[in-house]
Each structure stands twice: as structure tokens, then as C-alpha cells.
Amino acid sequence: MAPLKIMKTASLVSFIALAIAVTLYHLSHYGVFKTLAVTAGTSFYHFFVRLVVGIYIDKVKQNRADITRSWYRIRPWETAFYRRIGVKNWKDKMPTSFPEYYDLRKHTPLELAQVTCQSEIIHEVNVLISVGALLGAVPFGMFPAFFLSSLAAGCFDMIFVVMQRYNRSRLMPLVERQRRTAGKTGSGTVQGNKIGGTR
């Protein structure tokens, strides 16, 4: 099942579970149903808000990020770090919502680099969303449950942040090579974060 479909299904299932648990709690006032409602509600929050964030940023950015911005630049220490944790060995085993975005046969290195920037931002926002879930502990208590679920969700998103920055570190030499080639041959012009003649 595609990751996007999993997110939609998980959002729907957790919402239904939340509605059932809340109803049963109001009818019986059993504490177990309150616990189930909080669990289902937290799950719904993590899945649904991530789904909305991903769709929104995809619509707004449309894979046209400015790769020259400081936030997207790969720092000198990152290459050694990614090598040490073996990103190359496990990144292809992780799910991808839109694999067609990462096809070098269909897109230029610049376009792929822009995709990695957009994906990185989505997952970084998701990390903040995970932290936001801790606010649920204020009215409901159960801080350990909120903390552990937020920590797990945030760490999961950070894996994808690392992946996208690693991918971009591999793509940037290709982008620069294409930029130099375009400048020498006159087949394209460089304007902002786009290379003319590649679209």
C-alpha cells in the first residue's frame, strides 16, 4: 500500500476509533474508554495533520524550492555524518509517497534537488507537529504517553529529513556540473534557482 493511502486509511480508522471511544466513555464513564479515546485522538492528530501539511506544502511549493537558500545548503560535516550512519545502505528501503518525483530519467538534477528541499520542509514541520502533540497532556494528563508518541513520530520524520539532505548532497555536484555546461555551451541560462532550457 502506498504511503499516502496508508496515511489516509490510518486517519480514517483512528477518527472512527476516537468517535466510538468518546461515545462509550460518555455512556459508561469507564476510564478505559477515556484512555482509548486519548490514544485514538493522538493517533488521528499525528496522521491527519501530517496528511494536511504534506498536501498543503505540495500545492504551495510545487517542487520549486530555491536550493540556494542557506537552510537547504549541505554543511561540510554532514557528508561524513551520513556516511557514518550508513544512509546509503538503508534509504532505499524507506517508503516514498511519490517515487515518480525522484526519477532522474524524467527530471533534471535541479528538479530532483528541489523535490528534496520540499520533502525536507514537510518532515521538519512534522517534527514541530509532534512537539505540539505534547499540549494534549495539559487537559488529559498521561504525559508519558504523549511524550513517547511524540518522540517516536518526531524521530521517524527526522529519518526522512536526513535522507533528503543526503540525497541533495549527492545531487548538488550534478546540478553544478549542469550549470557549468549550460554556461559554456549557451544551451541554457541560469535564472534564480532554475536552469533555462531544462524544461
Show where each model-derived region lies.
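Hydrophobic core segments of alpha-helical transmembrane domains in multi-pass membrane proteins
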Residues: K34-S43, A133, A145-G154
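Membrane-interacting alpha-helical segments
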Residues: P144, L148-A152, F156-E176
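Transmembrane alpha-helical segments and their cytosolic interface motifs
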Residues: E111-G141
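Membrane-proximal soluble regions of multi-pass membrane proteins
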Residues: I55-L112, S169, R177-G197
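Hydrophobic alpha-helical membrane-embedded segments
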Residues: S28-A80, D157-V161
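Cytosolic-side membrane-entry/anchor segment at the start of a transmembrane helix
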Residues: M1-T39, V162-V175
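Transmembrane helix interruption/hinge and helix-loop junction motifs
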Residues: L27-V32, A137-A145
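Residue-level signal for alpha-helical transmembrane segments in multi-pass membrane proteins
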Residues: A21-Y25, V49-V52, I129-G136, F140, ...
